Design a protein with these regions (language model features):
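An N-cap/entry alpha-helix motif that binds or orients negatively charged groups
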Residues: 1, 5-29
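Feature captures the catalytic cores and cofactor-binding loops of soluble hydro-lyases/lyases
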Residues: 22-23, 27-46, 50-119, 127
Length: 128
């Protein structure tokens, strides 16, 4: 799914276009905890969050996400938007809830960043 399709599906406003282009979004994940993002985040993913802090932009850049979507009408600080511009990280603002945004993307075929049980790429074997 392309970022323009995400923007349309979420009825989002573009706070930062990331320098232009229309990147491919591989998958999506939703969390209000930066620690979760650092554990399961993947390059090329779309991050949906209501946590409108500078730390989210830093973590998103570290993971190399395709874009960040701030949900529930949350407005990130000017510092966060400025950092996103410097890092060429697209930032979208959606008026919809985290749940609603996730559903809108799911029905359009965008997979989640964490596979469902039984669909994992690798299986962890017990050493016990």
């Amino acid at each position: 799914m392309r970022l323009t399709e995400v923007t349309e599906a979420l009825e989002a406003e573009v706070a930062c276009d990331g320098g232009g282009g229309n990147p491919e979004v591989a998958c999506a994940g939703a969390s209000d905890m930066v620690s979760d993002l650092l554990v399961w985040g993947k390059p090329g993913m779309l991050l949906l969050t209501g946590l409108a802090h500078l730390s989210v932009v830093r973590a998103a850049h570290l993971i190399d996400v395709a874009a960040v979507v701030f949900v529930r009408g949350r407005i990130p600080s000017e510092d966060a938007v400025e950092l996103a511009r410097e890092l060429a990280l697209p930032v979208l603002l959606s008026p919809h809830s985290l749940y609603d945004c996730s559903g809108r993307l799911y029905v359009r075929g965008l997979p989640g960043v964490i596979p469902a049980r039984g669909e994992a790429e690798t299986t962890v074997k017990s050493t016990a």
